[in-house]
C-alpha cells in the first residue's frame, strides 16, 4: 500500500499510470477508482490492476495488486470458449478507414506470427460494483475474453474468476434502483444485457446490440453507466472530433436504451502530441459530481494518468463540457506554491511530459523536447495581490514568454539552466498561465513558482 497527498492533476504520483478510471463511492463512503495500469510505451495496459481510493479527494491510497493476468485460467487456453470481440463483417466508418490505412502500410509486407505461448497476457479496462456483501470486478483480457472476479473488500484482492459468455473490451456494470444489474461492453459496437442474480452470468439470447453507435452517437469504446434521478447516462469514448480523445454521453429512460446523443463532457486532445484515446466515468462524491478521465504522456499514446475535473449536471439534465485543468478537484495554485512541469494541462507543439530516473536522484518528470514556438498551459493560478515575479527550475537555454490570461506578463531568459531574470507584471486575479518558448536549446522545465 502506498499513500499520496494531492488534490490536483494528475492525481497520482508521476510514476503511477492508471487510465480508464471508473469511480465508485462504495458503502464505506470512500471513492474507489478502478482502472488499468500502463507500464510500457508501446502497449496499452499491462498484466495487473491496482485500485486507488480516497475519502476526501486529496489523500489517496494506492492499494496492493487487485488482480493479475496470471490469475485468469482461461487466457491462452486453447480449449477455453472463444467469443468474437468485433464484427468485421459490418465495419463502421472508422473501421473502414483503419483497414484501408493498414492495407496500404502492409502492402507486400509479411507479418511474423508469434506462437500462442509468446502472446502477452494483458488486462484491459475494468469496472466494479458492490452487491449483498460482495464486490464484483468485471475485467477483459488481451484475448478478447471477459470475466468477473470477487472479493469481500472494495480494493481486493479479487479471486475465483469466472469467464463470461461474450467477447470484447471495456466492461461496465450498473445496478438499477430495483436491484437489477446490467452489463455493458464493446469497442466500435456497444452491447448490453441483464445480469443474472448471481452477478456472474447472463443469457446470451438477451444481449441488446447497438445501444449507442459510431454513426449516431460517435461511440468508440469505454462504456460507463450512471443514473441521475430518472435519467440514465451512457458515458463513453467519443469520436465526434475525429479521434476518441473525448468523453461523450447519451441519455435515455431505460438502462438498455434507446439513447439520445447529448454531447461531450471533456476532451483530452492537447495533453500530449500523440494523445489518442480517452476512457472514464462520472460519479458524485460528497455532493459534487466529477468526471474521471486520463491523459497520455511521454510523447506516446500510453503512460496515461488519472485526472479529475468537477462537472455540473444542469436542471435539464445536460452536462456542460469542461476543460482540462492543472488544479483538477483542488484549488488554483497560489503565490509561492510549486507548480510541477508535469502538471501542464495543455501542450502545443513538440513539447511533452517526459520522464527520467537517475541513480540517487530517483524518478522525476518534466517538460521536455521543447521547440521554438511550443507552449505549455497551466490552469489556474490565483493571487489577491499583483503578480511581480516567476521562478522556473529548468535545464538548457531559451527565452520564455510568460502569459497570464493570454496577455504577456514578462519574459524570462534561461542560460544553461540558470535563470537570468524573474520580473513579470500583471494585476491580481485568477489566470491561465502559459509558457511560450523561443530560442530553445535543450530546454526542459521541472518546476515553476509564481508570485
Kindly give the residue locations of the regions a language model identified.
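Carbohydrate-active catalytic/glycan-binding domains of CAZyme proteins
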Residues: 1-411, 416-451
Amino acid at each position: 500500500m502506498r499513500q499520496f497527498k494531492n488534490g490536483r492533476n494528475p492525481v497520482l504520483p508521476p510514476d503511477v499510470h492508471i487510465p480508464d478510471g471508473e469511480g465508485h463511492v462504495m458503502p464505506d463512503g470512500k471513492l474507489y477508482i478502478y482502472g488499468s495500469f500502463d507500464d510500457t510505451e508501446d502497449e496499452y495496459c499491462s498484466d495487473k490492476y491496482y485500485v486507488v481510493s480516497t475519502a476526501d479527494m486529496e489523500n489517496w491510497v494506492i492499494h496492493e495488486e487487485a488482480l493479475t493476468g496470471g490469475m485468469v485460467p482461461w487466457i491462452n487456453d486453447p480449449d477455453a470458449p472463444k467469443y468474437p470481440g468485433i464484427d468485421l463483417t459490418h465495419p463502421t466508418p472508422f473501421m473502414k478507414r483503419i483497414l484501408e490505412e493498414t492495407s496500404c502500410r502492409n502492402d507486400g509486407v509479411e507479418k511474423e506470427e508469434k506462437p500462442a505461448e509468446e502472446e502477452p497476457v494483458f488486462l484491459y479496462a475494468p469496472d466494479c460494483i458492490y452487491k449483498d456483501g460482495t464486490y464484483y470486478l468485471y475485467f477483459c483480457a488481451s484475448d478478447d475474453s471477459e470475466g468477473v472476479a470477487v472479493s469481500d473488500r472494495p480494493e481486493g484482492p479479487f479471486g475465483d474468476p469466472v469467464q463470461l459468455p461474450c467477447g470484447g473490451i471495456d466492461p461496465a456494470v450498473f445496478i438499477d434502483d430495483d436491484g437489477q444489474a446490467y452489463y455493458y461492453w464493446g469497442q466500435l459496437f456497444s452491447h448490453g444485457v441483464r445480469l443474472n442474480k448471481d452477478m456472474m452470468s447472463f443469457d446470451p439470447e438477451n444481449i441488446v446490440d447497438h445501444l449507442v453507435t459510431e454513426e449516431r452517437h460517435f461511440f468508440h469504446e469505454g462504456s460507463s453507466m450512471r443514473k441521475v434521478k430518472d435519467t440514465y447516462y451512457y458515458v463513453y469514448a467519443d469520436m465526434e472530433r475525429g479521434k476518441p480523445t473525448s468523453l461523450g454521453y447519451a441519455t435515455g429512460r431505460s438502462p438498455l436504451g434507446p439513447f439520445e446523443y447529448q454531447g461531450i463532457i471533456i476532451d483530452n486532445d492537447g495533453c500530449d502530441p500523440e494523445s489518442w484515446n480517452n476512457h472514464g466515468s462520472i460519479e458524485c462524491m460528497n455532493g459534487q459530481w466529477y468526471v474521471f478521465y486520463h491523459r497520455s504522456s511521454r510523447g506516446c499514446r500510453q503512460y496515461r494518468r488519472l485526472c479529475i475535473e468537477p462537472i455540473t449536471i444542469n436542471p435539464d439534465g445536460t452536462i456542460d463540457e469542461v476543460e482540462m485543468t492543472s488544479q483538477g478537484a483542488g484549488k488554483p495554485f497560489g503565490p509561492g506554491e510549486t507548480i510541477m512541469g508535469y502538471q501542464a494541462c495543455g501542450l502545443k507543439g513538440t513539447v511533452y511530459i517526459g520522464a527520467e530516473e537517475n541513480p540517487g536522484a530517483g524518478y522525476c518528470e518534466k517538460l521536455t523536447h521543447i521547440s521554438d514556438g511550443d507552449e505549455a498551459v497551466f490552469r489556474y493560478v490565483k493571487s489577491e495581490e499583483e503578480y511581480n515575479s516567476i521562478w522556473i527550475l529548468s535545464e538548457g537555454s531559451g527565452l520564455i514568454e510568460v502569459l497570464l490570461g493570454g496577455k504577456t506578463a514578462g519574459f524570462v531568459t534561461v542560460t544553461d539552466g540558470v535563470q537570468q531574470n524573474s520580473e513579470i507584471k500583471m494585476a491580481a486575479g485568477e489566470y491561465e498561465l502559459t509558457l511560450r518558448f523561443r530560442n530553445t536549446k535543450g530546454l526542459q522545465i521541472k518546476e515553476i513558482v509564481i508570485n
